[in-house]
Amino acid sequence: GTEYTAPHILIETGGRPKKLGIPGEEYALDSNGFFALEEMPKRVVFVGAGYIAAELAGTLHGLGAETHWAFRHERPLRSFDDMLSEKVVERYQEMGMQIHPNATPAKIEKTAQNEYVITFENGESITTDAVIFGTGRQPNTDQLGLENTKVALDEKGYVKVDKFQNTTQNGIYAVGDVIGKIDLTPVAIAAGRRLSERLFNGQTDLYLDYNLVPTVVFTHPPVATIGLTEKAALEEYGEDQVKIYRSSFTPMYFAL
């Protein structure tokens, strides 16, 4: 192969959909497969508690598919405040989506009628036209040859970096999904810009603060957050230092 050398090398190889390792998982689609669909399934089961499953389930349900959303724990979107994830589930159920909490997939089988049956560890099974996994992503670090460097990875394969995006090898940096902090494209861009300003424009103290990044999940309705969740704030500052305010309102008649 061709050898390249440089004083600065940036790892920004992103991630890929994570497999569950269950029998019959080859019958399931991931987020890439979802966007390759040529026709809409009439019945669909989404598995996963994060952004991908939440958004895509809402999309197909809104288009008229019989939609099931299954996730391993009591509630989805667990990095958000309870009140937000509860509202998403409540609204989806009002719209007719079928929600399956505490449902861990055990296997997927294909029938003679070209249908799929997904069975969960709790014994529940659902017959459907498509199963779509939104069960997280894993970093693309396993084929980079990092074992030939001093770049350290964590137990999940993410590149370890400090607040300046430095890895444990001088001259090698990493940003984006490959570091496992906040897997959002604008965050990777912002981190990369700050890194380039630091390396090439003399702003030696510039770095991205990952603690105050706004994020939105495009569910129906969409939900957004920034900063600490209520639980995290209470754990960090104590109940006597945290005040919780809640407000609700009726949407305007002319609102879209």
Give the role of each language-model region.
Residues 177-184, 218-219, 250-255:
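Glycine-rich phosphate/pyrophosphate-binding beta-alpha loops
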Residues 35-36, 41-45, 51-115, 119-121, ...:
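Rossmann-like dinucleotide-binding cores of NAD(P)H-dependent redox enzymes
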Residues 16-18, 152-153, 202-212, 239-245:
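A short alpha-helix-loop-beta-strand transition element characteristic
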Residues 1, 121-123:
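Glycine-centered tight beta-turn/hairpin loop motif at sheet-sheet or coil-to-beta transitions
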Residues 3-14, 45-47, 67, 126-136, ...:
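Short hydrophobic core segments
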Residues 224-256:
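Structured beta-strand/loop patches that form or line metal/cofactor-binding pockets in enzymes
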Residues 25-41, 125-202:
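FAD-site-proximal beta/loop scaffold in flavoenzymes
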Residues 13, 30-32, 71, 101-103, ...:
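Short loop/edge segments at beta-strand edges and connector loops
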